[in-house]
């Protein structure tokens, strides 16, 4: 950043950094997205569900996933089925009240209708897991989400 830009507070976005793909022992094969400054790949859960995975660059100077990011991810993986159930259970009363004609959905029926979308590991160590609807568009283009803080607390919501 030039001296004049610094004096007048003019922000220049960091230059795009291109990085070669990596094979991380925890996250698997990842490719770098310089636009979003994150690593992206695919993850298969213990139950066989396929998620996209994105891992934020920890800082402007450090780009590779940190040990702490790996630890919070590894702590969330065994909870994926529980988090999906909590997300469905939280949303079901609103869904049945507003979005269903005829018989209301059961928890099991709605659970089948939502499919894995993304697991995002943020630089602040929050992990957000999201599920989207099947082609039936039951969620109206939204996603059920579970945001898990580094201490393991889960906040459930609907986004999009």
Region spans (language model):
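Acidic, proline/glycine-rich low-complexity IDRs
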Residues: 1-31, 108-160
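A general marker of short, structured functional hotspots
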Residues: 7, 23, 32, 47, ...
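Alpha-helical protein-protein interaction elements
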Residues: 19, 24, 30-31, 35, ...
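Contiguous hydrophobic, core-forming segments of folded domains
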Residues: 26-76
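Short linear interaction motif-like sites in intrinsically disordered regions of transcription factors
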Residues: 33, 39-40, 92-96, 106, ...
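Short, hydrophobic/proline-enriched secondary-structure or compact coil segments at domain edges
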Residues: 41, 84-88, 129
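Long, charged/polar, surface-exposed segments that mediate recognition or autoinhibition
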Residues: 54-115
């Amino acid at each position: 950043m030039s001296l004049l830009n610094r004096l007048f507070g003019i922000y220049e976005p960091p230059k795009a950094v291109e990085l070669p793909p990596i094979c991380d022992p925890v996250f698997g094969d990842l490719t770098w997205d310089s636009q979003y400054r994150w690593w992206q790949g695919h993850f298969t859960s213990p139950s066989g569900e396929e998620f996209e995975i994105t891992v934020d660059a920890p800082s402007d100077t450090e780009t590779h996933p940190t040990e702490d990011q790996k630890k919070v991810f590894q702590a969330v993986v065994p909870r994926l089925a529980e988090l999906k159930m909590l997300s469905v259970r939280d949303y079901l009363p609103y869904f049945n009240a507003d979005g269903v004609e005829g018989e209301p959905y059961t928890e099991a029926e709605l659970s089948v209708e939502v499919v894995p979308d993304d697991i995002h590991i943020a630089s602040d160590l929050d992990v957000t897991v999201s599920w989207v609807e099947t082609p039936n568009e039951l969620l109206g283009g939204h996603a059920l989400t579970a945001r898990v803080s580094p201490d393991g607390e889960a906040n459930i919501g609907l986004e999009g």
